[in-house]
C-alpha cells in the first residue's frame, strides 16, 4: 500500500470479536498479497452481540489503541457490531485510517436487490443500532429493509471452527462438512423463514462470522435470494 507515493511496509491491523474476522482478513490477503497483517480475535469477550453498544465501543478503542502502538498503518474493524458501536469514535480518536464493514455491505445490497426488499441478519446489538437499515436507506430511501437478530449463528460459527479437524483454509469445505446439521438447520429455519415470507430478494450477512454459514443459510433461504 502506497502512502504519498511511496510504499509503507507497516502492517494492516484487523480485529473482530473472535474467528469471524478471519473471513475479512482472508479477502485482504487475496486482494493485497504483498501486505502483512496483525489480527486480533477478542475471543475472551466474544460474542459482542449481546453486549451494550457503549461497552463494545470501549473494546474498540482499547484494541485500536493497541494496534496503533504496534505500528499499523490502518485498521479494519472486521466486526459489524464493533463497527456500529465504535467506528465513528475511533476515526476521531486515532490518526491512522480506520474502516468498518457496514457501509460496504449496505452498498452491495443496494446494488444487488431487484425488487427493493432487503433482509439483514446480524447480532442483536447490530440490529438494535439500526446501522444497516440506516446505511441502506441513506443510499436508497426507496428500499424496504427487514432486519432480524440471529445471535445463535455466531455461536454455531465459533463451534464449527473448533469442531474442524486441521487448519481452517477452505471455508466453503468447512461449511459443507460442519454446519449442515439438522440441529443447525432448525435454528436457521426459525430465523430465516419469516424473512423469506417477506419476499426479500437480497440478504445481508451482517456479521463477519456468517460467511462461514453460507451453505447453511443458502439451503434455508433459497437460491432466489
Each language-model region and where it sits:
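Non-catalytic structural scaffold of enzyme domains
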Residues: 1-225
Amino acid at each position: 500500500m502506497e502512502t504519498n507515493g511511496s510504499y509503507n511496509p507497516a502492517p494492516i491491523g484487523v480485529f473482530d470479536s473472535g474467528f469471524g474476522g478471519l473471513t475479512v482478513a482472508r479477502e485482504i490477503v487475496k486482494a493485497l498479497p504483498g501486505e502483512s497483517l496483525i489480527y486480533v480475535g477478542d475471543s475472551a469477550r466474544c460474542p459482542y452481540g449481546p453486549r451494550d453498544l457503549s461497552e463494545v465501543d470501549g473494546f474498540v478503542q482499547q484494541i485500536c489503541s493497541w494496534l496503533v502502538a504496534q505500528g499499523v498503518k490502518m485498521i479494519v474493524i472486521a466486526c459489524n457490531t464493533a463497527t456500529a458501536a465504535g467506528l465513528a469514535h475511533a476515526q476521531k480518536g486515532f490518526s491512522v485510517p480506520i474502516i468498518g464493514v457496514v457501509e460496504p455491505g449496505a452498498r452491495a445490497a443496494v446494488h444487488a436487490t431487484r425488487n427493493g426488499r432487503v433482509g439483514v441478519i446480524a447480532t442483536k446489538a447490530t440490529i438494535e443500532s439500526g446501522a444497516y437499515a440506516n446505511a441502506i436507506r441513506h443510499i436508497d430511501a426507496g428500499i424496504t429493509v427487514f432486519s432480524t437478530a440471529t445471535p445463535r449463528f455466531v455461536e454455531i460459527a465459533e463451534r464449527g471452527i473448533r469442531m474442524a479437524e486441521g487448519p481452517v483454509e477452505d471455508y466453503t469445505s468447512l461449511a459443507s462438512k460442519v454446519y449442515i446439521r439438522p440441529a443447525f438447520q432448525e435454528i436457521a429455519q426459525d430465523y430465516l423463514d419469516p424473512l423469506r415470507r417477506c419476499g426479500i430478494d437480497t440478504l445481508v450477512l451482517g456479521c463477519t462470522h456468517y460467511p462461514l454459514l453460507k451453505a447453511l443459510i443458502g439451503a434455508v433461504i433459497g437460491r432466489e435470494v
